[in-house]
Amino acid sequence: MTERFDCHHCEDSLFGRKYVLREEQPYCVACFEALFASTCEECGKLIGCDCKDLSYKDRHWHEACFHCSRCRGSLVDKPFAAKEDQLLCTDCYSQEYSSRCQECKKSIMPGTRKMEYKGSSWHETCFICHRCQQPIGTKSFIPKDSENFCVPCYERQYALQCVQCKKPITTGGVTYREQPWHRECFVCTACKKPLSGQRFTSRDEFAYCLGCFCDLYAKKCAGCANPISGLGGTKYISFEERQWHNDCFNCKKCSLSLVGRGFLTERDDILCPDCGKDI
């Protein structure tokens, strides 16, 4: 007895007929198409076994139905773009939706790398430094007067030059005597510690921190021998080419403050009138 070879669904014999295998089960063409064939997005008909099924994102088309929604040109084996469930050839998509390059004014095609800045777009090769004309790409850049500059060109053309190291000042900086300095270059002439944000003074146009200035140039107190800075409202007494801090201007014997009082001198000492009676 001959073994049966029937359609898995309708059980009609498949001897001498076309059939399709699915998951190792045979189906007649009619059953296969009714059960498994995709429906064409364009014409709404089934895509039969004798037709090529073109698919994109779970959507299916007959080969003859796979065309641009705008110009109706075939998209088979061609690049295309999707917009609001419509398929468009690259030309139609560019005319309808693509941004225009700020430099060359041509469309920026789908899939093309582009640069965007403040609502404008450029082809990657059109986004160039205004000075050296080289593509900026993903490097840092600085806008100036509606033009874009790579950092080295901007620094050469616009950045202030530090009076100390002669290099560009790109961020921050300090102005002293109407000249620009890097913060790290503006240092005490003596100890080289940074002066930015610190109190300092100058002598012969050279800047010094208060400590170095006092050590080098300040007069010494005749009482404690420490420097008298004279800065920041420091009060001191001066008498016969000698100086004292206010707190140090005291009677040598009784330590009474002599600020605003009469006093006597005994060699290098100063005395209050009472202690001076015995001289």
Curated annotation (Swiss-Prot):
Q: Keyword check for Nucleus, yes or no.
A: yes
What protein is this chain from?
A: Four and a half LIM domains protein 2
How the protein assembles, per its UniProt entry? Interacts with ZNF638 and TTN/titin. Interacts with E4F1. Interacts with GRB7. Interacts with SIRT1 and FOXO1. Interacts with CEFIP and calcineurin. Interacts with FOXK1.
Instruction: Report domain LIM zinc-binding positions.
Output: 40-92, 101-153, 162-212, 221-275
Gene3D superfamilies hit by this protein: Cysteine Rich Protein
Annotated zinc fingers (C4-type), start-end: 7-31
Q: Biological process GO terms, please?
A: negative regulation of apoptotic process; negative regulation of calcineurin-NFAT signaling cascade; negative regulation of transcription by RNA polymerase II
Alphabetized GO MF terms? transcription corepressor activity; transcription factor binding; zinc ion binding
What lineage does the source organism belong to? Answer: Eukaryota, Metazoa, Chordata, Craniata, Vertebrata
A Pfam family assignment? LIM
